[in-house]
A protein has these predicted regions:
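ATP-binding/phosphotransfer module of carbohydrate and carboxylate kinases, centering on a glycine-rich
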Residues: 1-185, 190-216, 262, 280, ...
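Short acidic/His/Gly/Ser-rich catalytic and metal-binding motifs that mark active-site loops
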Residues: 179-182, 226-232
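Phosphate-binding/catalytic loop of phosphoryl-transfer enzymes
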Residues: 153, 219, 228-333, 455-469
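Short, flexible micro-motifs
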Residues: 167-168, 222-227, 291, 295-299, ...
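Short, active-site-adjacent cap segments at secondary-structure transitions
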Residues: 100-103, 224-229, 272-274, 296-297, ...
C-alpha cells in the first residue's frame, strides 16, 4: 500500500492494522534523502540556542530549490524544526541554507504563523521572544552542549512520586529498596484550584512517608517543564488561571520542600523515565518512552547524564500524513496521539469499539486490557497498531538521538498488550531498518518496575548531605 505526501511516495512494509493511512516520518525522510542522492544536494544546518547559552546543532542536506521538489523540502525541514524544538528546546533558531527554506520557517514559526503555539511555548519557557535567524549554512554556530549528572542517590529514607494526568504514584524507598508503592487516581487537568494540586502531592508524600522510620529526601517527576524546581509550563495545570499559576503553581514544589524541611528535587517526568531505564539496564545511552496519559520521554547520554534538552516528544511529529490526528496543543500528528492512552482511545473508537459516554480514558484502557486478557482479536490488532507506531517512531528518533537502549513503559504497556507492542515494534525495525535493529534494543521493564519504577527512580534525585544516624 503506497502513501504519498508532498510528491514523496512511501511504501510501508508493515501497515498498522487499524490505522492504514499512517505515514511514518522515518519512511518519508528515507525516501527524501534517496531523492537528494539522485538529484544533488546543498547543506542545511539548524541550531537552537538555550537560555544558558548552550547551542545544539543539527546538520542535513536538501535538494537545491532550483532542482525542484521544494514542497517536499519545506515539509521535511518544517517537521524537522518542530521535532528539534520539542526534543532540544531553545529561544533562538538558526536556519542556515537556501533562503527559500529559511524564510518559510521564519513565517511559519511566528506569532501569526501555523506554528504560533510552538512560538508562544518556547517564548514562555525561555522567557525570551522566540526568534528565527535566516543565514548561510557556514554561519550557523556549532554545538555547545551542557550536560549534568542526575539522581542515582540510593542512600537513606526517601519518598519518590510521579504526577500523571490520571494518577499519582508514590514510593517509599530505604537504601534503594522500595518498601511501599501505590497509585491514586486524580484529575489535575480539570482542577482550577491550586490547592487541589498541593493537597494531592502532599497526600501522596505523607502516605508514603508513613512507611519510613524518617524522611531524608523527596524526589518527584511530573509532566511539563521544570527549572530549578519551579514549574514553567505543564499541561497538568492547564485549568489553573495564569495569575494563580504564577502565584501558586510555579513555586508549589519550593513551598512543599520548605514545609517538609528535607532536600527535594522535581524534574520532568521524561528525564526520570530515562533515569529509571538507565538504572535498571545498567547501560547507556537510554531513551525512555512512558506510554501513559500522554507520552513522557527522556534521554540519558553515553556518559549517563541528562542533556538539558526538553525531550517533550509528546509534542514532536512522527506521522507526515495530511489531516492526521490532532494534539489539542501542538497540532497534527504528534507523539501524544500515537504513544499514549489518547492513542489507544483514538484507535479503539475509529475501529468501532464502544464505551459508556462518561467513561474516562484510564477506565477505557482498563476495559481494553481486560478484553486483551480474554483474547479479543480486535484488541490484539489495536496493540499491533500501537507497536507499529513505536517501531517506525524509534527509527525516526534514531535520526536525532544516539541510541542503544529504548525502554518502553507506562500504563499502556501493562499486561499482555505490552508484549504485543514490543514484539511488533521489533518486527518493524528488523524488516524496515535492519541497520538500526542491529544496534538498538527495545525492551520492557518487568511488570512491577513498569508501573512504579518511575517514582522509585524519582526518589533517587536529591543528594542528602548528611544521613541521620
Amino acid at each position: 500500500m503506497s502513501l504519498s505526501v508532498a510528491g514523496i511516495e512511501v511504501d510501508p512494509a508493515i501497515i498498522p492494522p487499524l490505522d492504514p493511512s499512517f505515514l511514518p516520518a522515518s519512511l518519508f525522510n528515507r525516501e527524501y534523502h534517496k531523492l537528494v542522492s539522485a538529484v544533488g544536494s546543498v547543506p542545511l544546518r539548524l541550531a537552537l540556542e538555550g537560555s544558558d547559552g548552550s547551542i545544539s546543532e543539527f546538520r542535513t542536506s536538501v535538494v537545491p530549490p532550483a532542482a525542484g521538489h521544494l514542497q517536499a523540502t519545506l515539509l521535511l525541514i518544517e517537521r524537522t524544526v518542530k521535532f528539534l524544538l520539542w526534543q532540544r528546546g531553545g529561544w533562538k533558531l538558526y536556519v542556515g541554507g537556501p533562503a527559500e527554506v529559511g524564510e518559510h520557517i521564519k513565517s511559519v514559526y511566528s506569532p501569526t504563523g501555523a506554528r504560533k503555539f510552538d512560538f508562544a511555548f518556547m517564548s514562555s519557557v525561555y522567557e525570551h521572544p522566540f526568534e528565527v535567524v535566516v543565514t548561510s549554512a557556514e554561519a550557523v554556530p556549532p554545538s555547545k552542549e551542557n550536560t549534568m549528572p542526575l539522581g542515582r542517590h540510593l542512600d537513606g529514607c526517601r519518598v519518590g512520586f510521579d504526577l500523571g494526568a490520571s494518577d499519582r504514584k508514590a514510593s517509599a524507598v530505604i537504601n534503594g529498596e522500595a518498601v511501599f508503592s501505590e497509585e491514586i487516581v486524580w484529575d489535575p487537568r480539570n482542577a482550577s484550584d491550586p490547592d487541589y494540586h498541593y493537597q494531592g502531592v502532599m497526600d501522596s508524600i505523607r502516605r508514603a512517608a508513613a512507611h519510613l522510620p524518617r524522611l531524608d529526601a523527596v524526589g518527584g517527576s511530573a509532566a511539563g517543564v521544570y527549572i530549578n524546581n519551579r514549574a514553567r509550563v505543564a499541561s497538568l495545570y492547564r485549568a489553573v488561571p495564569p495569575k494563580l499559576f504564577a502565584e501558586k503553581i510555579a513555586p508549589l514544589f519550593l513551598r512543599i520542600r520548605d514545609e517538609l524541611g528535607v532536600p527535594m528535587e522535581v524534574v520532568n517526568d521524561g528525564e526520570v523515565t530515562a533515569l529509571a531505564g538507565s538504572m535498571s539496564l545498567g547501560g547507556n545511552p537510554v531513551l525512555g518512552l512512558a506510554l501513559g496519559s500522554s507520552l513522557a520521554s527522556g534521554y540519558v547520554n553515553r556518559d549517563g547524564n541528562i542533556t538539558g534538552w526538553l525531550n517533550e516528544l509528546a509534542f514532536a511529529p512522527v506521522d507526515y500524513r495530511m489531516n492526521g490526528p490532532l494534539d489539542e496543543w501542538s497540532g497534527d500528528c504528534c507523539g501524544s496521539q500515537f504513544f499514549s492512552q489518547q492513542a489507544v482511545n483514538r484507535v479503539a473508537v475509529s475501529a468501532g469499539m464502544q464505551f459508556p459516554e462518561k467513561l474516562g480514558l484510564p477506565e477505557r484502557l482498563v476495559l481494553i486490557q481486560k478484553k486483551m486478557e480474554e483474547g479479543d482479536a480486535l484488541v490484539a490488532k489495536l496493540y499491533e497498531t500501537i507497536g507499529t507506531y513505536v517501531g517506525y517512531g524509534v527509527a525516526y528518533y534514531a535520526d536525532f538521538y544516539d541510541l542503544k537502549h529504548v525502554l518502553i513503559l507506562g500504563r499502556v504497556t501493562t499486561g499482555p498488550g505490552g508484549e504485543i507492542i514490543l514484539n511488533k515494534s521489533i518486527e518493524v525495525l528488523r524488516k524496515e531498518f535492519p541497520e538500526i535493529a542491529s544496534t538498538v534494543s527495545i525492551a520492557l521493564p518487568d511488570e512491577k518496575s513498569r508501573r512504579v519504577g518511575q517514582s522509585i527512580a524519582a526518589a533517587s534525585l536529591p543528594a542528602i548531605k548528611e544521613i541521620p544516624r
